[in-house]
Amino acid sequence: MVIEAEMAEAELGRLGLSDVRVHHRAGVAWLTAPASDVAAIACDPLRGEVVRAVRAAGFAGVGVDLDAH
């Protein structure tokens, strides 16, 4: 899933989310992002684009890790 995470991060970068990192857990992509990006990631229309990008990379789902350090 490392390749899938890299693919997802590349696509997220094209969406303007270059500081977002993708971590895989049981086929689900967990995003860690600066607080300033979290609201944008969670709201349409960007939310839909993020979900499409992550699923296109091979993940079954996507979540945002709000407790990342």
State the predicted function of each range.
Residues 1-69:
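ATP/NTP-dependent adenylation/nucleotidyl-transfer catalytic domains that generate, transfer
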